[in-house]
């Protein structure tokens, strides 16, 4: 029996609501007779705003409560930023849809300077991401890298209040919320390799729910899905988390070939390891594991092990 109402679990931040409303609009455009309801939920990551994410630790800080809502039947799908989704999903849930990817790059935001290269030696740069902090410290050791938490609006307000000379945010979030004008410049992947899944929106649902699958299946973008699959396979092999700088970015160099770049670094930026491979898109996950193995061969294992992560760490 077809569903007449689709309940979407979402965080309550402006960006999360935008993403959920975007999915709702796509569903209604394809299935005009279906009602869509947003079910707002507060996650652990939303509650803890005074501590850097890397120190909070744990997996699924921004998704666990949404997944519980799915398993308890309070929602039919959950909409996530793919960079927040852990590698292992709870039993009974799946991730069948990844939408067409928005700009995956990091964005340089400043009211005074146009790019990283224009910043003075002791500039105050805000970002919550260890991945960004590591790459910034490696290339610009004289910057003051400061932690920055909160939603996009809060982070921009802190910049405008003079707490920072510049902040680094995901370009996708700024563009989705209508803040593209705040982007002074985009940061190339060569300068700052993006987070795994950055710019991509995923839809999670129950495995045994064919009615829901029928409603959302056509929203999947195969090119984005295969790119994110390669990135996530790399991260799964490394058994990484937000406590260590890990980056991964896959591109289609032609219709059938994937190029995947991966990075693991010391949090203080003193060491960055990089690896890159290309291969058939049909073998995206194998490509991800191969890039992870190259990083491990280069010495990523000890970096990960120091933080209780890596292939040999307990995954519980």
Swiss-Prot record:
UniProt catalytic activity: 4 porphobilinogen + H2O = hydroxymethylbilane + 4 NH4(+)
Entry EC number(s): 2.5.1.61
Residues that bear S-(dipyrrolylmethanemethyl)cysteine: 242
Cofactor(s) the protein needs: dipyrromethane
PROSITE patterns: PORPHOBILINOGEN_DEAM
Biological-process GO terms, alphabetical: protoporphyrinogen IX biosynthetic process
Key words, A-Z: Porphyrin biosynthesis, Transferase
Pathway(s) where this gene product acts: Porphyrin-containing compound metabolism; protoporphyrin-IX biosynthesis; coproporphyrinogen-III from 5-aminolevulinate: step 2/4
Listed GO CC annotations: cytoplasm
GO molecular function, one term: hydroxymethylbilane synthase activity
Cofactor annotation remark: Binds 1 dipyrromethane group covalently.
More info: The porphobilinogen subunits are added to the dipyrromethane group.
Functional note: Tetrapolymerization of the monopyrrole PBG into the hydroxymethylbilane pre-uroporphyrinogen in several discrete steps.
Quaternary structure, from the entry: Monomer.
NCBIfam families attached to this UniProt entry: hemC (TIGR00212)
Protein family: Belongs to the HMBS family.
Protein name: Porphobilinogen deaminase
Annotated source species: Thioalkalivibrio sulfidiphilus (strain HL-EbGR7)
Organism lineage string: Bacteria, Pseudomonadati, Pseudomonadota, Gammaproteobacteria, Chromatiales
């Amino acid at each position: 029996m077809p569903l007449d109402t689709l309940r979407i679990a979402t965080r309550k931040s402006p960006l999360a609501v935008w993403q959920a409303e975007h999915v709702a609009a796509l569903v209604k455009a394809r299935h005009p007779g279906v009602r869509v309801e947003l079910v707002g939920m507060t996650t652990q990551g939303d509650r803890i705003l005074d501590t850097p994410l890397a120190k909070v630790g744990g997996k699924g800080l921004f998704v666990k409560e949404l997944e519980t809502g799915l398993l308890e039947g309070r929602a039919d799908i959950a909409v996530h930023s793919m960079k927040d989704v852990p590698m292992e999903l709870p039993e009974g849930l799946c991730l069948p849809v990844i939408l067409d990817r928005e700009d995956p790059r990091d964005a340089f935001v400043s009211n005074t300077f146009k790019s990283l290269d224009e910043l003075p030696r002791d500039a105050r740069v805000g970002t919550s991401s260890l991945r960004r902090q590591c790459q910034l410290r490696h290339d610009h050791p004289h910057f003051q890298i400061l932690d920055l938490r909160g939603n996009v609006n809060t982070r921009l307000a802190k910049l405008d209040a003079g707490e920072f000379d510049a902040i680094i945010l995901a370009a996708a979030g700024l563009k989705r919320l209508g803040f593209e004008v705040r982007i002074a410049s985009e940061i190339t992947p060569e300068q700052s390799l993006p987070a795994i899944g950055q710019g991509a929106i995923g839809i999670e649902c129950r495995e045994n729910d064919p009615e829901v699958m029928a409603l959302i299946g056509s929203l999947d973008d195969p090119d984005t899905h295969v790119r994110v699959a390669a990135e996530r396979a790399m991260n799964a092999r490394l058994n990484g988390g937000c406590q260590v700088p890990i980056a991964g970015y896959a591109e289609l160099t032609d219709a059938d070939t994937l190029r995947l770049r991966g990075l693991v670094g010391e949090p203080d930026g003193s060491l960055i390891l990089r690896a890159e491979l290309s291969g058939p898109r049909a073998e995206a996950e194998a490509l991800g594991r191969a890039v992870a193995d190259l990083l491990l061969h280069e010495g990523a294992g000890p970096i990960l092990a120091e933080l209780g992560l890596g292939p040999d760490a307990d995954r519980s």
